[in-house]
């Protein structure tokens, strides 16, 4: 069994990473929705890989692309959203992809930061959305965004994704996580991009994050090397009580096909405040 951690500020030192490897971690994920591979050069070359060698672990380095995932743009500082208040998305307000503004209709709901915040669209204009805050909190840059119940057009790979893939060989990337896989074509696009860069040996991990991914699971299984059950956004696409059975259904299908899989999102989240994991 593999055990992956996520690289971040709290574990960005060689001694901490060495201890994590010694405790059983076999690889780490780097979220490229918030950074780039060149920006992480010192973390990878001076901390991560030396820690793996010191611990005697043949580690995996997984890069998590942005892909079709929707995110809030960059904010100069966090924006407080107060329950019952209003929020403007788009021109003159919180930056969001234009495709979201074009797809949204009054009454639609928008979840932010893996459902930590929830908005209802009250008015949809050509360049902005006026929303009511149903569940408030502090919104930070580049947090996830989902227009619930609607599909929003977005490319398999962004320009930033392709730039990061071009650096993957230099930094020893072993696996690529493709978010919001919608079917076979997304994975063929990624595999073609890797082949053009001479990265045929890099493994593809397909993230199942919505109902469309579940519906296309059989064809996704044929093209992916590994399946990732991403509970955060998957939970946004269905009522919460359906999530456990959906997770088990994907796992059962993977086992039947002999396809490796793993589960992510908030597995040890409760330990941010408690000494013993409850989730």
Regions found by a protein language model. Name each.
Residues 1-279:
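Non-catalytic helical/linker scaffolds that mediate oligomerization, partner binding
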């Amino acid at each position: 069994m593999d055990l992956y951690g996520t690289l971040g500020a709290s574990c960005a030192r060689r001694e901490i990473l060495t201890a994590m490897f010694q405790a059983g971690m076999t690889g780490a994920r780097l979220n490229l929705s918030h950074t780039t591979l060149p920006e992480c050069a010192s973390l990878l070359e001076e901390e991560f890989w030396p820690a793996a060698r010191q611990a005697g672990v043949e580690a995996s380095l997984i890069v998590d692309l942005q892909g079709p995932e929707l995110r809030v743009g960059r904010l100069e500082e966090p924006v407080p959203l107060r329950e019952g208040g209003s929020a403007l998305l788009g021109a003159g307000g919180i930056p969001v992809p234009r495709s979201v503004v074009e797809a949204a209709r009054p009454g639609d709901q928008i979840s932010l930061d893996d459902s930590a915040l929830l908005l209802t669209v009250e008015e949809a204009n050509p360049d902005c959305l006026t929303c009511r805050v149903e569940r408030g909190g502090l919104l930070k840059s580049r947090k996830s965004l989902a227009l619930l119940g609607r599909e929003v057009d977005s490319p398999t790979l962004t320009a930033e994704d392709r730039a990061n893939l071009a650096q993957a060989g230099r930094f020893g990337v072993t696996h690529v996580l493709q978010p919001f896989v919608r079917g076979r074509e997304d994975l063929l696009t990624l595999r073609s991009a890797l082949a053009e860069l001479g990265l045929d040996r890099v493994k593809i991990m397909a993230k199942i994050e919505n109902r469309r991914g579940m519906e296309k699971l059989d064809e996704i299984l044929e093209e992916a090397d590994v399946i990732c059950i991403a509970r955060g956004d998957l939970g946004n696409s269905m009522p919460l009580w359906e999530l456990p059975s959906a997770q088990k259904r994907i796992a059962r299908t993977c086992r039947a096909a002999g396809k490796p899989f793993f589960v992510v999102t908030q597995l040890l989240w409760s330990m941010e405040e408690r000494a013993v994991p409850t989730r």
